[in-house]
Amino acid sequence: MVKALLVGSKVLIPNVDESRYIYSTGFYGKAIGISKPKGPKDIIRPLELSLIESVYLAKKGLIKVIDKNGEVLEYEKLYEYSSKIINKFDIMYRVYEDLREKGFIVRSGVKYGADFAVYTLGPGLEHAPYVVIAVDIDEEITPHELLSFGRVSHSTRKRLVLALVDRKSESVRYIMFKWVKM
């Protein structure tokens, strides 16, 4: 199991060989100081993981997260910690996990105004074809919000996907929008 260190809202894998291994299992994390690696061979620095990635990898048994006091944070404790740091973490994590389990590569979508950028092949191999916004199925979305989501995805030539999370059934449903010129 790979040793990872919790540092605020990030998790660091200091060992470069272990960083390369984790990256190779599904394009997880970002190598510090390397902007666009083409593959695992380009991972020559420690890897920085988001909390969502870290919770997922901890649940899978791929990483062991250690806090500043040297305590190992098991999946449940790391999930609880992340819920306090990230707004709507439970919704975001449910979507992240569902997409990963379906075989997609899921990265942060912040630069696209979304929760996630989703790849079928991986970053460095293609541009993300989808941007995903995670929403509680019971939450109302105004027409204005929907248009603003669409504007971002259209200007970046990505398909907008709303991921609707039903907390009761723990299911995720997806609605994809394709914008057309008329």
Swiss-Prot record:
**InterPro entries linked:** tRNA_endonuc-like_dom_sf, tRNA_intron_Endo_cat-like_sf, tRNA_intron_Endonuc_cat-like, tRNA_intron_Endonuc_N, tRNA_intron_Endonuc_N_sf, tRNA_splic, tRNA_splic_arch_short
Q: What does UniProt list as catalytic? A: 119, 127, 158
For this record, the Gene Ontology CC terms, alphabetical, are:
cytoplasm
Extract the SUPFAM superfamilies matched here. Answer: tRNA-intron endonuclease catalytic domain-like (SSF53032), tRNA-intron endonuclease N-terminal domain-like (SSF55267)
Q: Which CDD domains match?
A: tRNA-intron_lyase_C (cd22363)
Recorded GO terms, molecular function? Answer: lyase activity; nucleic acid binding; tRNA-intron endonuclease activity
Q: Which reaction does it catalyse?
A: pretRNA = a 3'-half-tRNA molecule with a 5'-OH end + a 5'-half-tRNA molecule with a 2',3'-cyclic phosphate end + an intron with a 2',3'-cyclic phosphate and a 5'-hydroxyl terminus
The answer to keyword tRNA processing applying to this record is yes
So what EC number does this one have? 4.6.1.16
At the top level, the lineage of the source is Archaea
Q: Does the keyword Secreted apply?
A: no
What GO biological process, any one, is recorded here?
tRNA splicing, via endonucleolytic cleavage and ligation
**Which keywords fit this entry according to its UniProt record?**
Lyase, tRNA processing
Please state what class of enzyme this protein is.
Answer: lyase
Q: What does this protein do?
A: Endonuclease that removes tRNA introns. Cleaves pre-tRNA at the 5'- and 3'-splice sites to release the intron. The products are an intron and two tRNA half-molecules bearing 2',3' cyclic phosphate and 5'-OH termini. Recognizes a pseudosymmetric substrate in which 2 bulged loops of 3 bases are separated by a stem of 4 bp.
Tell me its family. Answer: Belongs to the tRNA-intron endonuclease family. Archaeal short subfamily.
Subunit text: Homotetramer; although the tetramer contains four active sites, only two participate in the cleavage. Therefore, it should be considered as a dimer of dimers.
Name of protein: tRNA-splicing endonuclease
